[in-house]
């Protein structure tokens, strides 16, 4: 499936449904962390639109497939 265009805030909102929690913000980047092991940390830019390459990379780091991400609406 094709990746949707989402903002940084929308990305964080969707990942909260998978157990990620907002930790803090450093400049224009939001830091989120998985609440259970392996406590994966992600740095998400707070932009209006995330580039599809960056979005794919963040999903890979989070261990979430594109299809799974799309279903998290």
Model-predicted regions and their roles:
Residues 1-25, 33-73:
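Basic nucleic-acid-binding interfaces
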Residues 30:
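Positions that flank functional sites
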